[in-house]
Amino acid sequence: MKYAAILVLLALAACAPRQAAQCEYMATRNAEFTRPGAHDVVTVRTIGPNCEEAIALYAVREADGHLIWTWSGPLRQLYAEGGEGAQAFLQQWALANLTTTSTAPEWRRLAPGQTTLDRLTYEDIRARNLPMLCHLSSAAREVCAFWEPAAGVAGLYFERNLETTR
């Protein structure tokens, strides 16, 4: 009987509502990633019990809601200031840097590991002047995705340190 009472208490404790996440922020912006005049939507959010342990998510959807690009990582990798300025940070992060693949560095200027593509594919994408979206992937690094209209998908193009972007 004593064990039954303990089991009942444990079961009740397991059913107790859990505390909601304390680092939940979101920002949304429109972007013209897939083509000029497109109504693509960038949504960024954080999810976690606190901002030190939160995950940051970057998602791009076409106007019809079709998901075309995502990136996620630890929030502290992007922003280490804590919860006070997280919403303001997300507002800035949602402002995608939109350009074209012709502005990407030439193959010979890439460091090993900056792209997962082979040389022929990288140079073909660069020469085709496709839409390109870049956003932060850490406090000092950004990731760039290209849009392939023939396939209707976005793909990882390359990553670069911020000091090499300007």
Predicted region positions:
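Post-signal peptide N-terminal segment of mature Sec-exported envelope proteins
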Residues: 22-40
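Positively charged n-region of N-terminal signal peptides that target proteins for export
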Residues: 1-4
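C-terminal motif of bacterial Sec signal peptides marking the signal peptidase cleavage site
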Residues: 12-14
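Bacterial signal peptide processing site
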Residues: 16-18
